[in-house]
């Protein structure tokens, strides 16, 4: 299989390594040409994804910012083989899929929205690894929800990544859920670490601090774009969370033991309900 990858960051680089390890031919387009040259010299990439190689690709994986993915697809759609499968790896789906599904229909190739639920607090090719996706969930947004043949084709194409599970959803539901499960934790972590007390945490912090602050180390440009593209869903979760925090704040301010125990017990029971 010939695989084309757009972007050589953590996700794109890990995809390249996984497919190369599985014996496939890998072409990559990357803004940083020096990094692309390094990847080629290191054997992680076979060559550049460009006008001559795009038509050769059986699978195209788009692993840059949402607008960049759509812009590239609009510019190169006419070069893509009608037998090719194109999957994006962006953290939002409505904006991407609403523009890419019509493109695929117009030019005859197949586009499926994708979101690999794997990552790291670090970004860039130097942190990429072939095993990044091993056992991780993959969310799929197909153009037709119940096309089992297409879903099997996608699973087969992604086999070298080693995903542990596949979830199929709509673009709207994806963005609603991802605001809660991914985007909100990044906001909370990033805001929490700004406390002036954080400067003196060493010697006083353990697992809970590490868990809460891990994703504060993020890519500001990328996450800002994701938050704004998913603005309504993120604001819904933020408003709910802020209201909830105010209840804890008021109970502590009022020294209201009963209310505080009630709030904590509600949270404990909700965790048991959703993850028990």
Question: Where are the regions a protein language model picked out?
Answer:
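Rossmann-like NAD(P)(H) cofactor-binding subdomain of soluble oxidoreductases
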Residues: 74-126
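Alpha-helix C-terminal capping/helix-to-coil transition sites in glycosyltransferase folds
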Residues: 55-56, 135
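Short beta->alpha hinge that forms the Motif I/post-I loop of the SAM-binding pocket
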Residues: 31, 64, 89
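N-terminal Rossmann-like NAD(P) cofactor-binding module of classical short-chain dehydrogenase/reductase
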Residues: 60-61, 87
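Interdomain hinge/lid region at the active-site interface
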Residues: 200-270
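Internal alpha-helical scaffold of NAD(P)-dependent oxidoreductase catalytic cores
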Residues: 130-214
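Short phosphate-binding/catalytic loops that engage adenosine nucleotides
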Residues: 24, 44, 109, 163-164
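NAD(P)+-binding Rossmann beta1-loop-alpha1 motif at the extreme N-terminus of oxidoreductases
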Residues: 1-51, 55
């Amino acid at each position: 299989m010939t695989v084309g990858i757009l972007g050589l960051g953590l996700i794109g680089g890990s995809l390249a390594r996984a497919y190369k390890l599985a014996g496939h031919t890998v072409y990559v387009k990357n803004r940083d040409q020096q990094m692309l040259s390094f990847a080629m010299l290191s054997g992680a990439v076979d060559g550049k994804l460009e006008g001559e190689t795009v038509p050769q690709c059986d699978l195209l994986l788009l692993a840059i910012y949402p607008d960049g993915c759509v812009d590239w697809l609009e510019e190169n759609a006419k070069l893509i083989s009608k037998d090719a499968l194109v999957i994006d790896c962006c953290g939002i789906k409505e904006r991407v899929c609403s523009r890419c599904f019509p493109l695929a229909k117009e030019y005859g190739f197949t586009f499926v929205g994708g979101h690999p639920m794997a990552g790291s607090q670090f970004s860039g090719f130097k942190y990429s690894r072939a095993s990044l996706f091993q056992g991780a969930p993959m969310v799929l947004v197909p153009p037709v929800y119940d096309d089992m043949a297409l879903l099997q084709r996608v699973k087969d194409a992604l086999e070298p990544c080693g995903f542990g599970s596949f979830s199929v959803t709509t673009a709207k539901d994806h963005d609603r859920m991802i605001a809660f499960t991914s985007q909100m934790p990044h906001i909370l972590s990033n805001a929490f670490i700004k406390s002036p007390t954080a400067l003196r945490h060493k010697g006083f912090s353990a697992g809970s601090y590490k868990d809460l602050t891990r994703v504060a180390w993020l890519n500001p440009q990328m996450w800002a774009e994701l938050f704004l593209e998913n603005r309504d869903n993120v604001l819904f979760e933020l408003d709910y969370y802020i209201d909830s925090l105010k209840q804890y704040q008021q109970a502590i301010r009022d020294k209201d033991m009963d209310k505080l125990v009630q709030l904590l017990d509600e949270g404990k029971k909700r965790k048991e309900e959703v993850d028990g």
